């Protein structure tokens, strides 16, 4: 939550501890949060826990090949494109859609971590944020929204 309002969701799925892999997905955010700090901050927390606490070897993310915003957001996280899964799932309208597959492996994590920390700066204390009650990061005085120094954030 931000300012005690739900702003979206992202989650672990397909966790396979024996193989040291998981997927991060089921991500959606309120339009007001698109292009802001929420996605990189949330992904930082999930990736940090996956690699540094859980000891995962690999994390994966997928996006519908028609969803350029999601593809761009995943790419900006530092994930590597691995290929397209053709006809991978049924869309809500009943059509088949292709899913683009991305990953971050443990050897990528230090560079990805540093890139995410740079993007979410000045929120360097992201792992100590109180997501349930909001936090006092730099705010736009008119709207109370989180703002950055102009770095692309999504």
Predicted regions and their residues:
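Conserved GNAT acetyl-CoA-binding A-motif
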Residues: 52-62
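A short, internal acetyl-CoA/4′-phosphopantetheine-binding micro-motif in the GNAT/acyltransferase core
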Residues: 2, 25-37
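Conserved catalytic-core motifs of GNAT/GCN5-like acyltransferases
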Residues: 62, 80-95
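C-terminal "cap" of GNAT-fold acetyltransferases
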Residues: 88-126, 132-134
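Conserved beta-strand-loop-alpha-helix junction that forms the acyl-donor binding cleft
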Residues: 61-71
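A conserved beta-turn-beta hairpin within the catalytic core of GNAT-like acetyltransferases
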Residues: 15-25, 34, 55-57
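A conserved beta-strand-loop-helix scaffold within acyl/acetyltransferase catalytic domains
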Residues: 1-20, 27
């Amino acid at each position: 939550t931000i300012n005690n309002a739900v702003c979206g969701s992202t989650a672990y799925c397909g966790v396979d501890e024996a193989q040291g892999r998981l997927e991060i997905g089921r991500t959606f955010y309120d339009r007001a949060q698109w292009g802001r700090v929420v996605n990189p901050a949330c992904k930082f927390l999930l990736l940090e826990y996956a690699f540094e606490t859980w000891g995962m070897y690999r994390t994966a993310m997928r996006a519908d090949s028609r969803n350029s915003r999601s593809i761009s957001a995943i790419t900006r996280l530092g994930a590597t494109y691995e290929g397209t899964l053709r006809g991978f799932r049924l869309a809500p309208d009943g059509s088949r859609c292709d899913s683009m597959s991305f990953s971050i492996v443990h050897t990528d994590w230090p560079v990805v971590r540093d890139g995410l920390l740079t993007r979410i700066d000045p929120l360097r204390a992201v792992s100590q944020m109180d997501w349930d009650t909001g936090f006092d990061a730099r705010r736009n005085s008119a709207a109370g929204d989180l703002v950055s120094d102009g770095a692309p954030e999504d």
